[in-house]
Amino acid sequence: MFRLKKYISPYLGYMVLTLLIKLLGTVTELMIPELMETILDDVVPSKSWNQIYLYGGAMLLCAVGCLVFNIWANRMSAISSGKITLALRHDLFAKLGRLSARQMDKLTIPSAESRLTSDTYNVNQLLARLQRIGIRAPILLVGGIFMMLRMDWLLALILIALLPIIALVVYFVTRKSLPLYTQQQTVLDKVVRTVQENITGIRVIKALSKTDYEKKRFHSVNDQLTHIDQKAGSITAITNPCATWTLNIGLTLVVVIGAFRVNSGGCQPGVIVAFLQYFTMILNAMLGITRIFVMFSKGEASARRVADVLELPEDLETQPGTEPEANSPYIEFRNVSFSYTGIGKNLENLSFTLEKGQTLGILGSIGSGKSTILALLLRLYDPDEGQILIDGQDIRTIPYEQLRSRFGTVFQNDFIMEGSIADNIRFFRDIPDQRLEKAAQDAQAEFIASKEGGMEADVQVRGNNLSGGQKQRLLIARALAADPDILILDDASSALDYRTDAQLRRALREHYRHTTTILVAQRVSSLRHADLILMLHDGTVIGAGNHETLMATCEEYAFLAQTQMGEAEEVC
């Protein structure tokens, strides 16, 4: 929790005030048994109604004060812990957005989700309970013992002798449960990942009749989580029964020994009644302290996981800039090599240049490095070797916002949000309606006009009420809407028929002459008009040139082109 002190510090004064109010409520609560003892042992024998009303009124005032102060403090603790958690979630979300793709690969999306939700919730609960019980329980414990020592030191020693037993139980439980709660959050990441995969791929799972298999896979991780939760719960479950049993033993001894002392004149009956009340307060205080330790185990484990992400060094910092190289190509890959894992190259010694307004086509088998080129150009990763330049400037020296504002991008299985068609194309950018219409027209998204409401027609989560081709055209319209300098289409026309694909390419050639376009596709027909085509295999370029050059010099390209041309006639 110490690692999150920057989030707690701004509210430290507010939290101290909360604790002071809680202290007032606790002190007024401690006064009630002593007032009762005075009434029973001094006021009642005197038969003075005025004193009975006076001390009775004082007890009532203390009870009301205790209620008001505790409610006030509890509300304040909820406000401060809520604001701290709000800032924590905000910074954690922003930090996740700044992490490189490589760091996110290591962290995993399910782990990021559970840290942003479950872990921050646990931190919130810990902060709130520390303010509510953290001052009240110790003050009740210490104050109760002090008041008991004032009344009868011999009876008080019985309780004091039992406290080390409870302290040992709390120490044992905390030591054993903290690693288990850390492990529990890690396994929770697996559960979230499994659920996420199943929900995302539910149609494929049903189509392949793999529902039973996925049930077994979920039951496996769910059983693992349940086992750890039960193990942690069985350890923490020791605390309350042990504390209650120990204190009840003490309570029994106090009643028995107290009865002998009353009979012998060693103390008054009111003292025994007050002792029983203080004993109940101390019992509740000890149980509260044990709950704090249990909550601390869970909250501390979560705080560590959150801090681990917040303290991650950002490995894609903008580097000091240099003067752009004169007379440089618009885009240049210069001897670029890259590996996702450090074992084997995903791209090896890749070099090519592209002038502004030209089109690059990338073709290759699965895993050949097509999408890796795009990820490097967008600087989702940095290359292990070599340079990537735009307008003669190394992209590592260009600020993120400035770099990525140049791009219009459509990835495979890209994000479609719930909302209107216009919202999805605009995507939180300041783009006029006329530009949205133009982008939709160029993307061949004529289906929009047939929808009820047109641009304001509803789109379901992940575009579930759209066909595959409609989704792709909607995403292409989004990429075109901002009139980007560089347009990236990663297999963005795979669901389009040949005619629509050809019309799309014609619109790009006619209306986006100054836009540099990079196409990744499986169809030769989608790339044949490109100024440069790269044929990749296992991260290496095995052919480079225009369509005619590759037909003459690259056997793999020629074979693929002839096979596809036999299936469909090119529509220009």
Language-model regions: role of each:
Residues 326-572:
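ABC-type nucleotide-binding domain
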Residues 10-12, 77, 98-102, 118-131, ...:
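An intracellular "coupling" helix at the cytosolic face of ABC transporter transmembrane type-1 domains
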Residues 10, 14-27, 66-68, 128-183, ...:
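Transmembrane helices of ABC transporter permease
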Residues 47-51, 147-161, 231-305, 309-310:
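Helix-loop-helix
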Residues 1-32, 36, 44-60, 73-77, ...:
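Membrane-integrated ABC transporters
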